[in-house]
Regions:
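Intrinsically disordered, low-complexity linkers and terminal tails enriched in Ser/Thr/Pro/Gly
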Residues: 1-203
Length: 203
Protein backbone atom coordinates (compact mmCIF):
# COMPACT_ATOMS: atom_id res chain seq x y z
CA UNK A 1 0.00 0.00 0.00
CA UNK A 2 1.08 3.60 -0.61
CA UNK A 3 1.72 5.18 2.79
CA UNK A 4 3.24 8.61 2.09
CA UNK A 5 0.74 10.96 0.47
CA UNK A 6 3.46 13.59 -0.01
CA UNK A 7 6.00 11.15 -1.42
CA UNK A 8 6.94 9.89 -4.85
CA UNK A 9 4.71 6.94 -5.83
CA UNK A 10 7.58 5.61 -7.97
CA UNK A 11 9.83 5.25 -4.91
CA UNK A 12 9.75 1.84 -3.16
CA UNK A 13 10.44 3.64 0.13
CA UNK A 14 6.89 5.02 0.10
CA UNK A 15 5.22 1.62 -0.12
CA UNK A 16 4.76 -1.13 2.47
CA UNK A 17 3.03 -4.49 2.76
CA UNK A 18 -0.63 -4.36 3.78
CA UNK A 19 -1.44 -5.13 7.41
CA UNK A 20 -4.19 -7.53 6.37
CA UNK A 21 -3.64 -10.61 4.20
CA UNK A 22 -4.89 -9.99 0.66
CA UNK A 23 -5.06 -6.22 1.12
CA UNK A 24 -8.28 -4.17 1.01
CA UNK A 25 -9.23 -3.73 -2.66
CA UNK A 26 -11.82 -0.97 -3.09
CA UNK A 27 -11.70 -0.08 0.61
CA UNK A 28 -9.52 2.17 2.80
CA UNK A 29 -6.19 0.72 3.85
CA UNK A 30 -6.02 -0.90 7.26
CA UNK A 31 -3.91 0.87 9.84
CA UNK A 32 -1.51 -1.08 12.00
CA UNK A 33 0.60 -0.46 15.06
CA UNK A 34 3.13 2.33 14.77
CA UNK A 35 6.69 0.97 14.59
CA UNK A 36 8.96 1.34 17.61
CA UNK A 37 12.15 1.50 15.57
CA UNK A 38 12.73 2.45 11.93
CA UNK A 39 15.52 2.52 9.36
CA UNK A 40 16.77 6.10 9.36
CA UNK A 41 20.02 6.38 7.39
CA UNK A 42 22.05 4.17 5.05
CA UNK A 43 25.58 4.63 3.72
CA UNK A 44 26.33 2.05 1.03
CA UNK A 45 29.51 3.49 -0.54
CA UNK A 46 31.73 4.74 2.26
CA UNK A 47 35.05 5.54 0.59
CA UNK A 48 36.49 8.14 2.98
CA UNK A 49 33.51 9.79 4.69
CA UNK A 50 33.27 7.96 8.03
CA UNK A 51 35.86 5.75 9.70
CA UNK A 52 35.32 3.01 12.25
CA UNK A 53 38.52 1.53 13.53
CA UNK A 54 41.04 1.44 10.70
CA UNK A 55 38.52 1.15 7.85
CA UNK A 56 35.56 2.94 6.26
CA UNK A 57 32.67 0.46 6.44
CA UNK A 58 29.14 1.05 5.22
CA UNK A 59 26.47 1.43 7.89
CA UNK A 60 22.78 1.34 8.67
CA UNK A 61 21.33 3.65 11.30
CA UNK A 62 18.20 2.83 13.28
CA UNK A 63 16.03 5.43 15.02
CA UNK A 64 13.78 4.94 18.04
CA UNK A 65 10.45 6.68 17.41
CA UNK A 66 8.61 5.09 20.35
CA UNK A 67 9.25 7.79 22.97
CA UNK A 68 10.63 5.20 25.39
CA UNK A 69 13.69 2.94 25.49
CA UNK A 70 13.49 -0.14 23.25
CA UNK A 71 15.42 -3.35 23.97
CA UNK A 72 16.62 -4.74 20.65
CA UNK A 73 17.55 -8.29 21.62
CA UNK A 74 16.50 -10.66 18.79
CA UNK A 75 15.64 -7.85 16.41
CA UNK A 76 17.40 -8.53 13.12
CA UNK A 77 18.71 -6.87 9.99
CA UNK A 78 19.11 -8.41 6.54
CA UNK A 79 19.85 -7.51 2.93
CA UNK A 80 17.67 -10.46 1.90
CA UNK A 81 14.04 -10.22 3.16
CA UNK A 82 13.68 -13.98 2.58
CA UNK A 83 16.44 -14.54 5.17
CA UNK A 84 15.50 -12.17 8.00
CA UNK A 85 18.06 -13.45 10.53
CA UNK A 86 21.30 -12.56 8.73
CA UNK A 87 22.26 -10.34 11.67
CA UNK A 88 20.60 -10.81 15.06
CA UNK A 89 21.06 -7.89 17.43
CA UNK A 90 22.60 -9.32 20.61
CA UNK A 91 21.28 -9.18 24.16
CA UNK A 92 21.82 -6.00 26.11
CA UNK A 93 21.48 -3.57 23.20
CA UNK A 94 19.12 -0.71 24.02
CA UNK A 95 18.17 2.21 21.81
CA UNK A 96 17.13 5.15 23.96
CA UNK A 97 13.95 7.14 23.42
CA UNK A 98 14.34 9.32 20.31
CA UNK A 99 17.88 7.93 19.98
CA UNK A 100 19.91 6.34 17.22
CA UNK A 101 21.87 3.12 16.79
CA UNK A 102 24.56 2.59 14.14
CA UNK A 103 25.21 -0.91 12.79
CA UNK A 104 28.39 -1.25 10.74
CA UNK A 105 28.12 -3.45 7.66
CA UNK A 106 31.35 -5.41 7.97
CA UNK A 107 32.85 -8.18 10.10
CA UNK A 108 35.56 -6.19 11.91
CA UNK A 109 34.60 -7.12 15.46
CA UNK A 110 37.82 -5.56 16.77
CA UNK A 111 36.44 -2.11 15.87
CA UNK A 112 33.90 -0.34 18.12
CA UNK A 113 30.17 -0.92 17.80
CA UNK A 114 27.92 -3.57 16.27
CA UNK A 115 29.00 -5.33 13.09
CA UNK A 116 26.47 -7.12 10.88
CA UNK A 117 28.89 -9.37 9.00
CA UNK A 118 27.48 -8.50 5.58
CA UNK A 119 27.77 -5.55 3.19
CA UNK A 120 25.42 -3.82 0.77
CA UNK A 121 25.84 -3.41 -2.98
CA UNK A 122 26.46 0.23 -3.87
CA UNK A 123 24.86 -0.37 -7.28
CA UNK A 124 21.54 -1.01 -5.51
CA UNK A 125 20.28 -3.25 -2.76
CA UNK A 126 17.59 -3.86 -0.15
CA UNK A 127 17.85 -3.60 3.63
CA UNK A 128 15.10 -4.76 5.98
CA UNK A 129 14.51 -4.59 9.74
CA UNK A 130 12.64 -7.34 11.60
CA UNK A 131 11.24 -7.52 15.14
CA UNK A 132 11.79 -10.52 17.47
CA UNK A 133 8.69 -12.24 16.04
CA UNK A 134 10.29 -12.18 12.58
CA UNK A 135 7.82 -9.57 11.30
CA UNK A 136 9.22 -7.04 8.87
CA UNK A 137 9.08 -3.63 10.53
CA UNK A 138 10.75 -1.52 7.86
CA UNK A 139 12.44 -1.98 4.48
CA UNK A 140 14.01 0.13 1.76
CA UNK A 141 15.18 -0.77 -1.72
CA UNK A 142 17.60 1.73 -3.23
CA UNK A 143 19.48 2.23 -6.48
CA UNK A 144 23.04 3.26 -7.34
CA UNK A 145 24.64 5.30 -4.55
CA UNK A 146 26.85 8.40 -4.55
CA UNK A 147 30.27 7.87 -2.98
CA UNK A 148 30.59 9.22 0.58
CA UNK A 149 26.93 10.29 0.68
CA UNK A 150 24.24 8.51 2.64
CA UNK A 151 20.50 8.42 2.09
CA UNK A 152 18.30 9.45 4.99
CA UNK A 153 14.64 9.34 5.87
CA UNK A 154 12.73 12.62 5.63
CA UNK A 155 9.08 13.65 5.64
CA UNK A 156 9.08 13.21 1.86
CA UNK A 157 10.67 9.77 1.73
CA UNK A 158 14.41 9.18 1.41
CA UNK A 159 16.82 11.90 0.27
CA UNK A 160 20.57 12.36 -0.28
CA UNK A 161 22.38 13.12 2.99
CA UNK A 162 25.74 13.94 4.45
CA UNK A 163 26.62 10.91 6.63
CA UNK A 164 25.75 11.51 10.30
CA UNK A 165 25.83 8.14 12.13
CA UNK A 166 24.27 8.41 15.58
CA UNK A 167 22.91 11.91 14.93
CA UNK A 168 19.97 13.61 13.22
CA UNK A 169 20.01 13.43 9.43
CA UNK A 170 21.55 16.29 7.45
CA UNK A 171 20.45 16.85 3.86
CA UNK A 172 23.20 17.12 1.27
CA UNK A 173 23.41 20.15 -1.00
CA UNK A 174 21.96 19.27 -4.40
CA UNK A 175 21.29 21.23 -7.58
CA UNK A 176 17.87 22.55 -8.56
CA UNK A 177 15.93 19.77 -10.31
CA UNK A 178 14.93 22.33 -12.95
CA UNK A 179 18.54 22.15 -14.15
CA UNK A 180 18.16 18.49 -15.13
CA UNK A 181 17.52 17.79 -18.81
CA UNK A 182 16.77 14.75 -20.94
CA UNK A 183 19.76 14.96 -23.28
CA UNK A 184 19.82 11.86 -25.49
CA UNK A 185 18.13 8.49 -25.86
CA UNK A 186 18.04 5.34 -27.98
CA UNK A 187 14.66 3.67 -28.41
CA UNK A 188 15.54 1.13 -31.11
CA UNK A 189 18.93 -0.34 -30.29
CA UNK A 190 20.74 -2.67 -32.67
CA UNK A 191 20.30 -6.40 -32.13
CA UNK A 192 21.84 -7.39 -28.82
CA UNK A 193 22.02 -3.80 -27.59
CA UNK A 194 19.97 -1.98 -24.98
CA UNK A 195 17.79 1.08 -25.20
CA UNK A 196 19.03 3.88 -22.96
CA UNK A 197 18.37 7.42 -21.75
CA UNK A 198 21.00 10.08 -20.97
CA UNK A 199 20.38 12.90 -18.49
CA UNK A 200 22.37 16.15 -18.35
CA UNK A 201 22.93 18.30 -15.27
CA UNK A 202 23.12 21.96 -16.34
CA UNK A 203 24.02 23.22 -12.86
Amino acid sequence: VFENSNGDPDSPANWRASFGKGGTPGRPNLSGPEPLVILNEILAENVTAISNGATHPDFVELKNVAGTNVYLQNWSLSDNPAKPRKFNIPAGVVIKADGYLTIWLDDDHEAPGLHAGFAMDNDGDTIALFNPAGERVDVITFGMQVADHSIGRSVNGWVLNQPTPGKANKNASVADLKKLRLNEFVAAARAGGDDWVELYNMA
